[in-house]
Amino acid sequence: LIVSLFGRPKSAIYGANVGFNGIDTSGIMALRYDGFVATAAAAKDSDSPSFFMIQGESGWIRADGAPNELPSFTVGLRGSEPKTYALNRYEHRMVHEFEAMQDIFARKDYMSVEEGMQTSRAVMAVMEKARLMAGIQFRAD
C-alpha cells in the first residue's frame, strides 16, 4: 500500500522474525521518502486486528481491517470532525477491482495497465531488497 501511494522509497530497511523454515513470519519495514518516513508492520503469525493509518500535519486517514479489503475508512482533518466512509457496494472485496479491470480492457486503456505494472515492479523491487536484507533466501536465489 505504501509504495502504491507514495512510489518507490529512497531507501528501506526491514527487520524480520524468521521462522524455522527460513521464511519471515512477521516484521517491520521503514521506508524513507523525501520529507517523511513510512513504517509498516505485518504479522502472519498473529491473529490481531489489522488496520492502516496515514498521519500528516493536516490530518489523518485510518482504515480498520486488512488494507486489501478496505471495508471503511475515517478521515480526520485538523479542526474538523472525523468522517467515516464505507464505499464498498459489494460483499466480495474484489468485485470493484474486477470491474475496474473490465473497464480498462473494454477501453483498451494500455496506459493504466502500464501504470499498474510499474507499481507492481516497484513493490517487488522493494520487497526483494527487504527479503535479502533480512537474510531470507529462496531456492531460486
Positions of PLM-derived features:
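Contiguous beta-strand/loop segments that form the cofactor/metal-binding neighborhood of enzyme cores
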Residues: L1-E69, E99-K108
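C-terminal helix-rich "cap/oligomerization" subdomain common to oxidoreductases
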Residues: A100-D141
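Surface-exposed loop/edge segments in extracytoplasmic proteins
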Residues: S80-T84
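Solvent-exposed strand-loop boundary residues in beta-sheet-rich modules
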Residues: S58, L77-G79
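Active-site loop of classical SDR/Rossmann-like NAD(P)-dependent oxidoreductases
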Residues: L87-E99, E115
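Short, acidic/hydrophobic/Gly-rich beta-strand patch recurrent on exposed beta strands
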Residues: M53, T74-L77
